[in-house]
Amino acid sequence: MKCLGKRRGQAAAFLPLCWLFLKILQPGHSHLYNNRYAGDKVIRFIPKTEEEAYALKKISYQLKVDLWQPSSISYVSEGTVTDVHIPQNGSRALLAFLQEANIQYKVLIEDLQKTLEKGSSLHTQRNRRSLSGYNYEVYHSLEEIQNWMHHLNKTHSGLIHMFSIGRSYEGRSLFILKLGRRSRLKRAVWIDCGIHAREWIGPAFCQWFVKEALLTYKSDPAMRKMLNHLYFYIMPVFNVDGYHFSWTNDRFWRKTRSRNSRFRCRGVDANRNWKVKWCDEGASMHPCDDTYCGPFPESEPEVKAVANFLRKHRKHIRAYLSFHAYAQMLLYPYSYKYATIPNFRCVESAAYKAVNALQSVYGVRYRYGPASTTLYVSSGSSMDWAYKNGIPYAFAFELRDTGYFGFLLPEMLIKPTCTETMLAVKNITMHLLKKCP
């Protein structure tokens, strides 16, 4: 096709059209996140001895790896499953070190950029903003999620009320959906998703939960009982600034986006910023670390807003559920110490039944137990804070998977993940209504 006409003026006018046409014909020419992850790898290793663990921690620190699992290099010890994202310019050095030290490893993701683009539909031309045909089996941007919330608030006013509890560091509204049949005195359940920005399956589940509640309210006796007897306060995206940043700049961003007066590094771990054994074991005081606890408890506007809301309503809120990824675990207090909670039997029974219900769908197994022994010790967590502040049922879900995809859980796994998790949440809620005060 010739784009140039006889006259230069006409040719100049047609050049932009030709360029656009060629871009459409070659969609692979542009890459997500400016191709920043090309050649990056995700590598798993499990140190067999403390000597290996020490050596791995040292090389990981030197190469500035992005730790996927566990959340801090300090957790790496003998037998710890460790997944690291290593940039292309450091992968050769890391692999050479592992081979020379005779440390066994496995490359989980050979090229992070290719995996990212293959497993995501961010670069397609699908109409993702059509609220009438909202697709719950794809990941949605913050703008799309908040538009969806506004839409539900208008179209389902009998069961949904939307409100804001404050603003984020960058000025974004912190929206909540109050779900349930309206009544004066009702117990409540709090659900939040997306405390850590890169854990996209969390917000996907929060949306799925709302969808299922609205669709099955009339047909499912259990759901009808839940919404008639309880309110659900649902925060689909807790860390709104970080989540937005993970869509526009860095897919694997974890923290909030607050600035630090002394360091160029931005953000605080919103799950280390709560006033419960703040900045103790499992949290970092360095602003550049992913587990940075912040300059003081509740320093982050997002954490402060949620803490204030929970404090105000703690007499009625009987359960706190927070959704994370990845590990396939259902955790309960304590995170910050090795100790048994007073209502252990009730909470442990609920967790046991929840993971069994979850497994009954697709056979996916979740570990369950106190966070400190099942995962690792961490201080300043939202779950521990909720429990310490009078909410007797406090759980944290670590959703799929166990590392094959990690934070890049494909969209084709959203439906099965949310379907099985829905059963677990319903089980916990019904257990709360039947047995525990």
From Swiss-Prot:
<feature type="binding site">
    <location>
        <position position="254"/>
    </location>
    <ligand>
        <name>substrate</name>
    </ligand>
</feature>
<keyword id="KW-0225">Disease variant</keyword>
<dbReference type="GO" id="GO:0004181">
    <property type="term" value="F:metallocarboxypeptidase activity"/>
</dbReference>
<dbReference type="GO" id="GO:0005615">
    <property type="term" value="C:extracellular space"/>
</dbReference>
<feature type="binding site">
    <location>
        <begin position="325"/>
        <end position="326"/>
    </location>
    <ligand>
        <name>substrate</name>
    </ligand>
</feature>
<keyword id="KW-1015">Disulfide bond</keyword>
<feature type="active site" description="Proton donor/acceptor">
    <location>
        <position position="398"/>
    </location>
</feature>
<feature type="binding site">
    <location>
        <begin position="271"/>
        <end position="272"/>
    </location>
    <ligand>
        <name>substrate</name>
    </ligand>
</feature>
<dbReference type="InterPro" id="IPR033843">
    <property type="entry name" value="CPAH"/>
</dbReference>
<keyword id="KW-0378">Hydrolase</keyword>
<protein>
    <recommendedName>
        <fullName>Carboxypeptidase A6</fullName>
        <ecNumber>3.4.17.-</ecNumber>
    </recommendedName>
</protein>
<feature type="signal peptide">
    <location>
        <begin position="1"/>
        <end position="30"/>
    </location>
</feature>
<keyword id="KW-0887">Epilepsy</keyword>
<keyword id="KW-0165">Cleavage on pair of basic residues</keyword>
<feature type="binding site">
    <location>
        <position position="324"/>
    </location>
    <ligand>
        <name>Zn(2+)</name>
    </ligand>
</feature>
<feature type="binding site">
    <location>
        <position position="376"/>
    </location>
    <ligand>
        <name>substrate</name>
    </ligand>
</feature>
<feature type="glycosylation site" description="N-linked (GlcNAc...) asparagine">
    <location>
        <position position="427"/>
    </location>
</feature>
<keyword id="KW-0964">Secreted</keyword>
<keyword id="KW-0121">Carboxypeptidase</keyword>
<dbReference type="Pfam" id="PF02244">
    <property type="entry name" value="Propep_M14"/>
</dbReference>
<feature type="binding site">
    <location>
        <position position="196"/>
    </location>
    <ligand>
        <name>Zn(2+)</name>
    </ligand>
</feature>
<keyword id="KW-0482">Metalloprotease</keyword>
<feature type="glycosylation site" description="N-linked (GlcNAc...) asparagine">
    <location>
        <position position="89"/>
    </location>
</feature>
<keyword id="KW-0272">Extracellular matrix</keyword>
<keyword id="KW-0160">Chromosomal rearrangement</keyword>
<dbReference type="InterPro" id="IPR036990">
    <property type="entry name" value="M14A-like_propep"/>
</dbReference>
<dbReference type="InterPro" id="IPR003146">
    <property type="entry name" value="M14A_act_pep"/>
</dbReference>
<keyword id="KW-0862">Zinc</keyword>
<feature type="propeptide" description="Activation peptide">
    <location>
        <begin position="31"/>
        <end position="129"/>
    </location>
</feature>
<feature type="domain" description="Peptidase M14">
    <location>
        <begin position="138"/>
        <end position="432"/>
    </location>
</feature>
<dbReference type="GO" id="GO:0008270">
    <property type="term" value="F:zinc ion binding"/>
</dbReference>
<comment type="similarity">
    <text>Belongs to the peptidase M14 family.</text>
</comment>
<feature type="disulfide bond">
    <location>
        <begin position="265"/>
        <end position="288"/>
    </location>
</feature>
<dbReference type="Pfam" id="PF00246">
    <property type="entry name" value="Peptidase_M14"/>
</dbReference>
<keyword id="KW-0479">Metal-binding</keyword>
<dbReference type="GO" id="GO:0006508">
    <property type="term" value="P:proteolysis"/>
</dbReference>
<feature type="binding site">
    <location>
        <position position="199"/>
    </location>
    <ligand>
        <name>Zn(2+)</name>
    </ligand>
</feature>
<keyword id="KW-0325">Glycoprotein</keyword>
<feature type="binding site">
    <location>
        <begin position="196"/>
        <end position="199"/>
    </location>
    <ligand>
        <name>substrate</name>
    </ligand>
</feature>
<keyword id="KW-0645">Protease</keyword>
<comment type="function">
    <text>May be involved in the proteolytic inactivation of enkephalins and neurotensin in some brain areas. May convert inactive angiotensin I into the biologically active angiotensin II. Releases a C-terminal amino acid, with preference for large hydrophobic C-terminal amino acids and shows only very weak activity toward small amino acids and histidine.</text>
</comment>
<dbReference type="InterPro" id="IPR000834">
    <property type="entry name" value="Peptidase_M14"/>
</dbReference>
